[in-house]
């Protein structure tokens, strides 16, 4: 999110799954909501259930324009990822998947993993952007894709 904003708006932890509450960031043309991770978070069963409830509540909001779904390109989709994709499809929620941490893979492996994830999660090519915050890869493309996602709502 910091790379997307072009400045430090979110605290970054070295440990995945540290987000425990809804964080809202005002961007120039939209609001970005950072939700707790539903799958990788090292949280109690009760907390994970509460995270899922919060996510469903946000997805059901009528003003929701779309979801920016951050997925680690190195990891296989979890059962939780598949359940979220089913929820997005069921609710007809527009989805844009940002495949993060691409700098950890060779270029050929990035393309292969993107294709595998696209297939596994039943996404279209224009619903995915390969990104690396460290290398600033895909950030411009991600901003453009977000603009395309919110354009119908703001036009």
Residue spans for each PLM region:
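Conserved G1/Walker A P-loop phosphate-binding module
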Residues: 1-42, 46, 151-153
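Short, glycine/charged-enriched secondary-structure capping and boundary segments
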Residues: 2, 45-48, 82-86, 111-114, ...
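Flexible beta-alpha connector loops of hexameric P-loop NTPases
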Residues: 38-48, 74, 103-106
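Conserved C-terminal guanine-recognition region of P-loop GTPase G domains, centered on the G4
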Residues: 53-126
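Canonical P-loop GTPase G-domain recognition
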Residues: 104-155
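Amphipathic alpha-helical transducer elements in NTP-driven molecular machines
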Residues: 19, 48-52, 78, 136-139
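Conserved alpha-helical scaffold flanking the Walker A/P-loop in AAA+ ATPase domains
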Residues: 20-27, 52-60
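Active-site glycine-centered loops adjacent to acidic/histidine catalytic or metal-binding residues
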Residues: 34, 100, 132
């Amino acid at each position: 999110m910091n790379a997307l904003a072009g400045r430090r708006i979110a605290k970054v932890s070295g440990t995945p799954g540290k987000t425990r509450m809804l964080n809202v960031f005002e961007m120039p043309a939209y609001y970005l909501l950072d939700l707790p991770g539903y799958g990788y978070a090292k949280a109690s069963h009760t907390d994970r259930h509460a995270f899922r409830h919060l996510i469903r509540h946000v997805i059901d909001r009528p003003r929701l324009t779309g979801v920016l779904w951050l997925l680690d390109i190195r990891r296989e989709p979890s059962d939780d990822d598949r359940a979220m994709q089913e929820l997005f499809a069921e609710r007809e929620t527009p989805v844009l998947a940002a495949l993060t941490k691409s700098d950890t893979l060779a270029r050929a492996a990035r393309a292969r993993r993107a294709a595998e994830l696209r297939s596994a999660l039943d996404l279209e090519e224009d619903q995915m952007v390969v990104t690396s915050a460290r290398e600033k890869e895909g950030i411009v493309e991600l901003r453009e894709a977000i603009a395309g996602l919110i354009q119908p709502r703001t036009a």
